[in-house]
Amino acid sequence: MKTLKYSWRFLMRSKSYTIINLLGLACSLACSIILMRYIHRELTVDTHCIDREHVYAICTNTEGNRGLSGLKQYNYDTISIDNRFVEAMTTYIPLEKDYVISGTNRIPARCLVTDSVFFQLFHYPIVQGKLSLTTPQSALLTEKYARKIFGNENPIGKILRYSNGKDITVEGIVGEPECKTTINFDIILSSKLSQHWERMNTELYRFLPGTDINAINKTGSVPRYINDPEYDTRTHTFSLISVKDIYWDGSLTDREPAMFLSGNRSHLIILSGVCLLLLLTGILNFINLYLVALLRRGKEYGLKKVFGVCGKTLFANIWIENTLLVLSALLVSWLIIEIMSAPTEYLFDTHFSYTAFDGWLSASILLLLPVITSIYPYIKYNYTSPILSIRSIGAQSHSKHFRMFFLGAQYIITFLLVVLSLYFNRQLGMLLSTKPGFRTKNIMNVNLVYESKDFSSYTYESMQQRRQRVMQLDNELNACPFIELYEPSYENILTPTFGTNYLNNKGEKVFLNIHYATPAFFKLYDIKVIEGEIPDINKEDRRTVFVVNKAALKALGYTSINGVGVIEENQKKANANASLQPIVAVVEDYFEGHLTSGIKPTIYPVGARFSGDLYQIAYTPGKKKEVIDFLRNLEYKLYGSEDFEYTFLEDDIKAMYTQDRQTATIYSIFASIAIIISSLGLLGISLFDIRQRYREIAIRKVNGASAKDLYRLLFRKYITVLIIAFVIAIPLAYYLINTYTQDFAVRAPVSIDIFIISLLLVIIISLGTLAYQIQKAAHINPTQIMKTE
């Protein structure tokens, strides 16, 4: 207790250093804790799964196109997993753009079709009702979706009309798991509701202990035919992928972005690096300022050692002081985190709730950080001769060198973060300003066709009615004066496409992406035809012609389309006599996704019309409101509801760069905080160093030194440290930038102005911190100083 009181009294006597140290460490801890919470949340995705490392999905690979699927839906050359090894098996079908009807309102819904076994593998909290799908009509709603439809009413037992025309009954309300989840939905439907859904299911397996997963994957690596090879020579392979790994493989789920979340390991590594650098900056700053404070007690420690104080007592004294500081900084950091919770959640696009991890993290910081920060001061004073401690307070050259070393290390990190911040903001600016190669203004992506996803619900009459509605829809769109062009499809221009192998006239195999289109597609997006001509194909014309982009033409080994053609490899395998189909036109390249992914060689099978619920609509500039009102009235006329989903292409493109924007913002914010922490460290050190040199300054003034000479003298040491730190940081920053962006098709140049701006920015802010103290020191009264020193 006596040691505790003594430590507290020392901290209170050194209020300036204590406050500066406390603020620097609190800022560092707050930023590091925020980042560690986010990183932990990313690393614990899907922990609501009973065993996410040993629950597996089937990942199929068909001619280079990977996706989650099942084995039971392949009817030719089939293979199945031996049920003797299976502990539990379930399936699910994601229906991203589905809907339900409540009263007269059509409400968009992300539906997940599954069975009760799903809840044996994934644990969801039950808010109301029961967590089961006992009947075909059973449905479970998320708490948020139930509130959206029913408000504060009790939803249990309520009836909703599903898109297939069947009624479903709300049996239960599920809450959100504490962890982040890959699959996100609004409604869970029973797989018994229909036998013929719009898309194939995905199978999930939990195997018995001892099952050889590698043996199953080896069996799955053997190519097998999808259909009878006489007509279809495509093959597929399969492998097992754990639930834990699905999140990190976005290519498996990128066609349903509203239902599936995916992670980016590179992004997480960046955040981990920023977290480590900020924490290191705070720790170095803490140790450095604490050493400065201890220099004032060098004589005291020397006398204590003369009178027999042992090393344990000295360490206990230093450790308690550091623990008090760390505890105070930790409390302040959590206060900062709480105050900044709303901006933080907006920045990271996730909700942070308090979990056991927060407690363990705080306890670890409180236990480990005081020990880490006490080691060097303890070694320094325990093994320093008492005579040296008594003779001098901070006059030893090695003390100054260590202070400058720690300060320099802080500034290396600061320069590194500032350079990275400037670069990634420039990279973001380039991504947002680079034209994708197609028209983006005044284009909407609109879901206009709201028909059943349940194929078993269709009869001849209902199919005819559907055709009539779609024909009426097209006629109304053609008659609208505000709509220039439209294109019905299942995806928009940004949606990831699949591909397959094509053969050129030499029989060489080339993988090309496939994008089905009509002649209107190229006009709608202002995609320039650079060779040949895309023919006008009317509705009665059932032919399909091939158009390629420049990248595909180059990949095929052609320089012109004159006399050349392509054929799908599978078609050639099925019919050796099949001839190449001519390429009628070449269009300009464009980026159909994130710019860093580059331009993909693409072939366009162009026909009269392709069906789809998604309409890509180009409208007259300045007529946005009129078009939306027109579409709302059209939906009401066709389906009896004014509700429909739409986005604008410009917004969709901006959304692609959300993570890039987040990275740039994080670097900017935390680089600014690193500057603040380093400036606080510089302030604390300069408070001591300049005060120690008052007698020297007084003597120099007596001998005729001008204020300009004193400014140069006092600034020189700190500028030297900053320049050395900058020189060391340049190659580190250059290496990190090049390593991270080496696979980017589009990246900003690493120009010298980034480094110059970072140098000027840090120097101006840092030396501005010193200005008042140096001005004060340069204008001291030599007589007064000589009397008191």
Could you tell me what each predicted segment is?
Residues L35-D98, R199-R206, N217-S221, S239-D249, ...:
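Membrane-proximal extracellular/periplasmic loop immediately following the first transmembrane helix
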